[in-house]
Amino acid sequence: MKIPVSGISALNRSLLQIKGPDATKFLNGLSTSRFLPNIVKKKQHTIDEAENRHAKLSEIININDNWGLMHEDIYDPDNNIFVRRDGLNSMFLSSKGRVVTDCFLYSQPFHNLNGTFEGQISEPTYLIEIDSSFTSQLQMLLKLHKLSAKVSIETIKSMHSYYYYNDTAEFDEYLDFIQQEFFRSRDPVDALNNANSFIKSEVLFNPKLAGNILGFSIDNRIPNFGIKVLMDKEIGDDDNKIPVDDLFSSSFKDNFVVPEILKPESITRRRFMNGLFETQDSPKESSLLPFEMNLDLTNGLSLEKGCYVGQELTIRTYNNGIIRKRIVPIQFFEINDDNLSALDESEYLTLDPNDPVIRELQDLHSSTLSKLEITPLIEKKDSPPPEPEQQSSSPFANSKPVRRRTASSGKLLSIQDNLGFVLANLSDIENVDLYKIELPCLEGGVKHVGIKVFKPEWWPID
């Protein structure tokens, strides 16, 4: 099955507003992204000119103003930090360094073209966009750490989150142009001017809807993966909604087809096809680390921001330079010669909602996924046979030999049609990409289903 080349869809998201004089400090202490302009070197024993390049950020950014957000990529060799008004990917962690939820963070408002949002730009204001299933959990975390901070925490129900993508080479180049032209500012004044120019230029949106566009982000978790836009009105065909044709500018429509409105499932399927995991994909009781969720590869982590909740384990892992497990995409298949031959030649995930293997998976409850054993489909022939157990001379010893369970090669986290995600040992998948899982059968015994592990092509080359 192929999803449409382009499309736009509403997302099941909640938006929390953090507003007040201490909003910048407050979020800096809780999220994995940098909000304060001071630099805390990730390796104190080194002297690196690149790490000192932004020492004057504290002179440029006044944290008591509505100044924007800092965008950075920890793997950028130039160590660029851009001050921008558009949103970015981030996470909130527990005190033990485990992921509470991933999110997108926005400065509010995104723009102030013609003074449209003049009344809202007087003090630091941010929006946190999360999957709706994590709203209560994140609210509790924020309120727990609020203490005497001068911030208000409010759920915003009047905004709607939309995701647009276009999987053509032309749009990929178009997004490169947009970012180069409007989103490389290094101070708050330029950031706001560029955001205003972006709306006014009609390069993407209809400027007549400037007052309806409350937030904007380029999704660079995967380079140029799509765009996100926060609206104060719904998009659709009903009389009280904004027609999708009206959202985009004339110049945009001269170059690209007006997208069809898709269901959120299409956005989810596209993520699975591209190996992009989100917190809600795994069971609620999952306990994951940010590096396991590839946060460092999706532009959601700052290493020079100082202390924040969950920071100690995260920075220690980075400094040790050893990441043993990561979440990787997989494709399920029925184990037979035809499938093995086809998958042996396949370099990309193939979504097929009609794959017969789905019948074997559909009755699995999410809480049982991580308990399923994953082992190599073909055992290594050169593996030495297990040594026989030494018989104890004790008369009280158990004479029955003990069967030692082989260690599972990973943990199954989620299933979408015939695709899914596994938390895998990187050392295992370097050498083996075909595995099997044991599924319990109602008739008794077990049934095996095949898994092929894929390393996303957007991962950096080792």
From Swiss-Prot:
Principal place where this protein is found?
mitochondrion
InterPro entries in UniProt: TrmE/GcvT_dom1, YgfZ/GcvT, YgfZ/GcvT_CS
Gene Ontology BP, a term:
iron-sulfur cluster assembly
Q: What stretch of residues directs this protein to its organelle as a transit peptide?
A: 1-43
GO cellular component, alphabetical, reads: mitochondrial matrix
- Example of a GO MF term: transferase activity
Q: Which superkingdom does the taxonomy of this entry point to?
A: Eukaryota
> Annotated region Disordered: where?
378-402
Q: Which UniProt keywords apply?
A: Mitochondrion, Transit peptide
Q: Where in the cell is it found?
A: Mitochondrion matrix
| Family of the protein in this entry | Belongs to the GcvT family. CAF17/IBA57 subfamily.
Question: What is the official name of this protein in its record?
Answer: Iron-sulfur cluster assembly factor IBA57 homolog, mitochondrial
The root-end lineage is: Eukaryota, Fungi, Dikarya, Ascomycota, Saccharomycotina
The protein's gene is named CAF17
